[in-house]
Regions:
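Catalytic-core signature of thiol
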Residues: 1-237
């Protein structure tokens, strides 16, 4: 089967020096917050990696555009094309891959952003509960997940019951590869009875999902979480 979209994430090599976000210290604050949504620089921006394996560059660019506030160090993206070219540059400078097809390690891209002076710190958030707490109390998170063929398409049952577009996770479908996406929202207690979900900001243009975004249930993410998740800040800690 030919995949309708291109992926491009690699599993980070283990490094005991990785800083882990101290989410346990934020747990009390997170318990009082159910919902957090971060707004893109332009809510109409939907960058598209096309047929290139640059999801790590594009996902990190989405994270920059959905930061918790306006950061003086972050790039000022004036158009989708400028954001797209920034993402490609981040990928190339991280990997040296002029084919734009070999994929990238998420940690390396975070390190490159730090080298450029665009961020001051980046942290690993390896567990699902760490991701949830980081989203509720800190800011957007990037997640690397195995991408099954079912996930290219929506879950019609959930969409019918709760609206929007939900990622369909069927672990019995074929594994297409690994994908890096920005998570720019979370709702742990939807008021319409829907399951708790993460809002993902994909890099496949506005034609995928709900104008380029989708909901991934937290339970589905638990089944997928086996790779790497990162968050970053313009501040040094």
């Amino acid at each position: 089967m030919t995949a309708p979209y291109t992926l491009g994430a690699k599993r980070d090599r283990y490094d005991p020096r990785d800083y882990k976000l101290a989410s346990h210290s934020l747990a009390a604050q997170a318990s009082a917050v159910d919902r957090k949504m971060y707004t893109m620089v332009s809510p109409d921006f939907r960058i598209d990696q096309g047929n290139e394996g640059t999801c790590v560059g594009h996902g990190d660019t989405n994270m920059l555009m959905a930061g918790t506030s306006t950061h003086k160090s972050y790039p000022d993206f004036q158009s989708e094309e400028l954001a797209h070219q920034f993402a490609r540059k981040l990928y190339f400078e991280t990997t040296g891959d002029s084919t734009y097809q070999q994929g990238a390690y998420p940690r390396d891209a975070c390190a490159k952003l730090k080298d450029w002076g665009l961020i001051g710190s980046y942290w690993s958030v390896p567990q699902v509960d760490d991701v949830v707490t980081a989203l509720l109390t800190f800011g957007p998170v990037g997640i690397a997940v195995p991408w099954y063929t079912s996930m290219f398409y929506g879950d019609n049952r959930l969409s019918s019951d709760f609206g929007n577009y939900w990622v369909k996770v069927n672990l019995d479908s074929d594994l297409a590869g690994f994908h890096w996406v920005a998570v720019t929202g979370i709702d742990m207690a939807p008021d319409n009875g829907a399951p708790p979900f993460l809002r993902i900001e994909n890099s496949w243009g506005e034609g995928w999902g709900w104008n380029g975004t989708a909901r991934l249930s937290v339970e589905s993410f638990r089944r997928l979480n086996q790779l790497d998740n990162w968050t970053f800040s313009e501040e040094s800690f």
